[in-house]
């Protein structure tokens, strides 16, 4: 394991304004040798006198690689969206080449799948975001630092019944031209990125999913290295897996996981498409579903800890298998040969106690949890990691950040 780059102490401590000023200082240091680089935009409306900006840590809540591995987009809890260049010349401390801030907290987002620092078509270097009481908006990732970021497109996300804007708790691009947004009451919308109005808005019926599940929040869309059809899946905070056919706007309840967990927050697929790996809040296991058996539960990957409200997002690498961080700064690994067969051996037997990890890598100091792991699509050995202590804790130092690692 080798650390390639990191954000240093930029996000250490508490205070949103403090983090942005340290980030600016690192950027200014890069400018001194004569690099022709622009200024970084300042946060909007931040003043040191506002107590909330002194108290809250700046934790990264989303990481997305560009398709060619040239850059990394990070969404932080200071309402900032940052893009980092990934190159050997940048040195060990990472500073964003672009950043902008939203006045409101970002609930969910999706980066265009063709985004790249070397992408000539600027219409592909975009991110769609959802904020509370706001319509969905599309922003450029490459903007003029001397001007506030302006939305390229605004989408009509208002509910026809209440006329209030639906907040999206999950967003994902379906292809290069369309994106999905998941909100409350099992509602999913499909948008053409170039048009204001949705193509369709649909939800799982009360008859199909039950009265309680009908009111559930769509929390995530499935993630896969390879897709074999147009069907997508979504998880809800009622621990239900939904099946979505974008061609017909059909949404149906596919599997309800009945355990003591409190909702699905991530769905990963094996490369062969046979197995789905379900990450849940307040759970000590990853549930394994078999798509060939109507999403029957066929196994459990046991975690040596219990997840809580702060989500720990994993990734699936063809080379390194399923990876997820824990609360002790370690990466737990299930090898590819285990993941591709659902942890089921040749005899078809499954241990009653579940499958434990096949490898552990120590990454961060004890007390820092690994919140997100994202593989580099252009280099199977490189991963981006977001780490922080418990953001709800009382630790004043609250050392958080991002690092790039070669496994």
From Swiss-Prot:
Kindly state which keywords UniProt assigns to this record, in alphabetical order: mRNA processing, mRNA splicing, Nucleus
GO BP term, example:
mRNA processing
Q: Where in the cell is it found?
A: Nucleus
At the top level, the lineage of the source is Eukaryota
**Matching InterPro entries, A to Z?**
SWT21/TCAB1_mRNA_Telomere, WD40/YVTN_repeat-like_dom_sf
Could you name the Gene Ontology cellular component terms for this entry?
A: nucleus
Task: Read off the SUPFAM superfamilies from this record.
Answer: NHL repeat
Description of how the protein assembles with itself and partners = Associates with snRNPs.
What's the family?
Answer: Belongs to the SWT21 family.
Q: What the protein does?
A: Involved in mRNA splicing. Helps to stabilize the U1 snRNP-5' splice site interaction.
Protein name per its UniProtKB record? Protein SWT21
Q: Which organism is it from?
A: Eremothecium gossypii (strain ATCC 10895 / CBS 109.51 / FGSC 9923 / NRRL Y-1056)
Give the taxonomic lineage as stored in the record.
Eukaryota, Fungi, Dikarya, Ascomycota, Saccharomycotina
């Amino acid at each position: 394991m080798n650390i390639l780059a990191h954000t240093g102490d930029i996000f250490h401590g508490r205070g949103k304004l403090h983090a942005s000023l340290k980030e600016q200082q690192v950027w200014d240091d890069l400018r001194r040798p004569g690099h022709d680089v622009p200024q970084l935009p300042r946060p909007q409306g931040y003043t040191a006198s506002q107590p909330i900006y002194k108290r809250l840590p700046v934790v990264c809540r989303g990481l997305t690689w560009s398709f060619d591995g040239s850059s990394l987009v990070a969404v932080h809890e200071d309402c900032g969206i940052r893009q980092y260049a990934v190159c050997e010349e940048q040195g060990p401390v990472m500073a964003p080449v672009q950043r902008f801030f939203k006045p409101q907290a970002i609930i969910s987002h999706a980066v265009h799948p063709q985004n790249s620092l070397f992408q000539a078509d600027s219409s592909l270097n975009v991110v769609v975001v959802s904020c509370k009481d706001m319509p969905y908006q599309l922003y450029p990732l490459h903007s003029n630092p001397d001007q506030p970021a302006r939305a390229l497109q605004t989408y009509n996300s208002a509910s026809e019944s209440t006329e209030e804007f639906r907040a999206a708790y999950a967003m994902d691009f379906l292809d290069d031209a369309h994106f999905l947004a998941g909100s409350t009451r099992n509602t999913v919308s499909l948008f053409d990125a170039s048009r204001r109005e949705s193509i369709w808005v649909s939800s799982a019926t009360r008859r199909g999913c039950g009265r309680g599940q009908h009111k559930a929040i769509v929390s995530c869309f499935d993630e896969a290295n390879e897709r074999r059809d147009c069907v997508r899946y979504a998880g809800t905070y009622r621990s239900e897996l939904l099946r979505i056919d974008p061609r017909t706007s059909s949404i149906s309840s596919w599997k309800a996981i009945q355990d003591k967990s409190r909702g699905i927050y991530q769905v990963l697929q094996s490369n062969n498409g046979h197995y789905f790996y379900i990450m849940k809040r307040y759970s000590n296991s990853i549930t394994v579903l078999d798509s060939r058996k109507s999403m029957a539960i066929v196994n459990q990957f046991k975690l040596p800890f219990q997840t809580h409200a702060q989500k720990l997002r994993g990734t699936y690498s063809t080379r390194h298998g399923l990876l997820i961080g824990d609360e002790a700064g370690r990466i737990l690994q299930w090898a590819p040969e285990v993941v591709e067969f659902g942890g089921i051996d040749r005899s078809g037997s499954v241990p009653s106690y579940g499958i434990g990890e096949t490898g552990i890598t120590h990454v961060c100091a004890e007390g820092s949890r690994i919140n997100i792991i994202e593989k580099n699509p252009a280099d199977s050995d490189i991963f981006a990691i977001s780490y922080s202590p418990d953001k709800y804790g009382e630790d004043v130092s609250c050392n958080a950040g991002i690092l790039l690692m070669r496994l």
